[in-house]
């Protein structure tokens, strides 16, 4: 405990603060000054406690991360079953097919929204009526852990806060960034090529507001502590509804400062530390995940000193794996993986190859030459995909993500299945928690009709499935989608019971060449040697360091006995998980 000697007016009482409360006050002091920091801290703790007391049973039972943690990413209406509600259909699908392979479902924003498939939130506290209601969310949480998005950087222009801004009313009149001009904004880092400032007609005339992502997504002003208090309320209402994981969407852009890049500012890290300190103080089981699709060093900075995010995405992994399999060359992946620092104790990575967004290319900066990044872009175009652009610092436009369904990126035919499965099985072996996007899990292809109907290139990978159609597809053993789903499901089941795949288990790159990579995962109970082939032809590869205890082992995936004292045969694109029990 830490003694707080700052007495309230008229009192000489001292207050014994916990470590987390002390961190809360210190970070609020950085953000808003010393005068009101203690008051703000107490107010935020009261807000959090008030939400948690409403449903005390939903935020108990903390549990450590393990190999059994495996995530599914999907929309609330990814699976449909008219006339029933999509969230009910999702539960039917998940309970029938995923009980042994998936532990957590990340339901992408399921709140009323005006654009961007949920990421322009109108009402943070309500479930979209066309999806279901909170009882459907609670029903899912009975069978799976859940992840919710906290869309914290911006809200919809249809949000009541922005209606207040337009009307000059409290509280929202001071919740947004009103900018007189572009002066001082020349260095702002842009994730898009849309205008940074949007002109809005208000009762007081035309105003310019900050819009990082689109003119429908208005950035919130966290220099106003009332805005942060609003999001403390929202965060803990989600925790009270049973969220085990909270994803902080677009968090890197949160704090704005004139004449700076307005990305990854220290104040943004302070806000994350405030949320983390509150979670620690309330002793909830909830873990924070930051979404920062940036170069690796910037991304992992959100671990802080074990006082910010519990989890960060390993964004570089997805495009590096894609490059390795498309061009039969794993050297960039090996170079990057070899120099990876392990996450701090108590923290972990989240790994994926595909998500609802495109395949980000900014995480390749400094890892892959521009000419080879262009090769990836060209390959996506050749396979029916799109390249999304952002405005660079010099005013030019540059590709920031590839919009394409993952199986289409691999070629989208039966002959591409071995590479597609191998890529996933390698991703599953990397240190961290694996996350599979539903459309990739079932081998979905480019949804060009979706692009045409919405006018947005990201819709190419955001298709929906009718539950009965999906069941029919998965029951037909000879089609590509059924083969992919069955093998990925089996791989996830196997992974879940291997202690060496726990997020805390050590990782070491033993060797890599253009054709192959050797990866070692180890904890006190088990060693798993992972071999991945990037070759379209059969190859043989040898264990880099001979060890007597590794002479004969079992491949968990193929169930073959493998002798490691001689070259190991590998089929095209094969991945092996060689298990060695410790005695």
Label the predicted regions.
Residues 2-545, 558-583:
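Active-site and adjacent substrate-binding regions of carbohydrate-active enzymes
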């Amino acid at each position: 405990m830490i003694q707080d000697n700052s007495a309230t007016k008229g009192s000489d009482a001292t207050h014994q603060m916990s470590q987390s409360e002390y961190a809360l006050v210190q970070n609020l002091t950085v953000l808003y000054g010393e005068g009101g920091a203690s008051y703000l801290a107490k107010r935020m703790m009261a807000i959090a406690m008030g939400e948690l007391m409403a449903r005390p049973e939903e935020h108990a039972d903390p549990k450590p991360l393990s190999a059994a943690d495996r995530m599914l990413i999907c929309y609330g209406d990814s699976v449909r079953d008219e006339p029933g509600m999509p969230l009910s259909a999702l539960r039917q699908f998940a309970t029938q097919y995923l009980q042994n392979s998936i532990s957590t479902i990340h339901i992408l924003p399921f709140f009323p929204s005006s654009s961007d498939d949920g990421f322009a939130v109108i009402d943070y506290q309500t479930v979209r009526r066309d999806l279901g209601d909170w009882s459907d969310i609670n029903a899912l949480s009975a069978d799976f852990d859940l992840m919710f998005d906290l869309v914290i950087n911006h809200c919809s222009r249809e949000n009541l806060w922005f209606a207040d801004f337009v009307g000059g009313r409290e509280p929202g009149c001071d919740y947004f960034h009103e900018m007189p001009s572009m002066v001082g904004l020349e260095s702002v880092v842009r994730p898009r090529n849309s205008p940074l400032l949007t002109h809005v007609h208000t009762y007081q005339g035309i105003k310019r507001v900050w819009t990082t992502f689109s003119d429908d997504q208005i950035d919130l002003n966290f220099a106003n502590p009332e805005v942060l208090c609003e999001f403390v309320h929202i965060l803990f209402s989600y925790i009270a509804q049973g969220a085990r994981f909270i994803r902080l969407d677009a968090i890197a852009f949160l704090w704005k400062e004139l004449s700076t890049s307005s990305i990854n500012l220290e104040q943004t890290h302070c806000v994350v530390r405030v949320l983390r300190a509150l979670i620690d103080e309330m002793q909830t089981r909830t873990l924070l995940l930051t979404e920062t699709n940036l170069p690796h060093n910037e991304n992992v900075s959100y671990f802080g000193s074990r006082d910010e995010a519990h989890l960060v995405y390993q964004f570089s992994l997805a495009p590096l794996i894609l490059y390795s399999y498309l061009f039969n060359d794993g050297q960039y992946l090996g170079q990057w993986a070899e120099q990876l620092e392990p996450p701090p104790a108590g923290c972990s990575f989240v790994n994926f190859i595909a998500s609802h967004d495109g395949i980000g290319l900014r995480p390749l900066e400094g890892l892959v030459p521009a000419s080879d990044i262009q090769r990836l872009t060209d390959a996506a175009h050749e396979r029916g995909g799109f390249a999304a652009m952002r405005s660079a610092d010099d005013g030019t436009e540059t590709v920031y993500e590839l919009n394409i369904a993952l199986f289409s990126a691999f070629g989208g035919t039966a002959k591409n299945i071995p590479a597609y499965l191998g890529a996933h099985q390698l991703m599953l072996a990397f240190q961290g928690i694996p996350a599979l996007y539903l459309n990739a899990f079932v081998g979905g292809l480019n949804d060009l009709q979706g692009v045409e109907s919405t006018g947005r290139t990201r819709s190419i990978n955001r298709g929906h499935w009718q539950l009965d159609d999906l069941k029919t597809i998965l029951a037909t053993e000879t089609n590509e989608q059924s083969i992919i789903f069955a093998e990925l499901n089996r791989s996830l089941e196997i992974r879940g019971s291997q202690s060496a795949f726990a997020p805390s288990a050590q990782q070491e790159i033993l060797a890599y060449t253009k054709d192959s990579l050797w990866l070692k995962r180890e904890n006190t109970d088990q060693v798993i040697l992972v071999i991945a082939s990037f070759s379209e032809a059969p190859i043989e590869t040898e264990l880099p360091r001979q060890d007597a205890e590794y002479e004969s082992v079992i491949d968990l995936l193929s169930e073959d006995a493998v002798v490691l004292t001689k070259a190991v045969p590998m089929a095209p694109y094969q991945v092996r998980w060689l298990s060695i029990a410790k005695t």
